[in-house]
Amino acid sequence: MNDLALALGLGIPLSLLVGVIIGYFISIKIFKKQIRDNPPITENQIKAMYAKMGRKLSETQVKEIMRSIKNQK
């Protein structure tokens, strides 16, 4: 009976700790993938930002800016 209580007393917290650590790394990986696939700034936002500064960007320049944002890691 004592062995079972000791095993449960050590096994449950250890399992919870391992689960929390694994969950943390999985959530970080998913978050980074979502940010990479859906950057927090859009092409329209870039165009609007440059329009406020008095510049009109071509599509090539907008794509280049988006590519440079995605390549920053």
Curated annotation (Swiss-Prot):
> Is this entry keyworded Membrane?
yes
Recorded hits in InterPro entries, A to Z, give: UPF0154
* Membrane topology, record value: Single-pass membrane protein
Q: Where in the cell is it found?
A: Membrane
Keyword list (alphabetical) reads:
Membrane, Transmembrane, Transmembrane helix
Q: Which domain of life is it from?
A: Bacteria
Major localization listed first in the record, in broad terms: membrane
One CC-aspect GO term: membrane
Q: Where are the transmembrane segments?
A: 6-26
Name the family the entry cites: Belongs to the UPF0154 family.
- Can you name this protein? UPF0154 protein MG335.1 homolog
Which species is the source of this protein? Answer: Mycoplasma pneumoniae (strain ATCC 29342 / M129 / Subtype 1) (Mycoplasmoides pneumoniae)
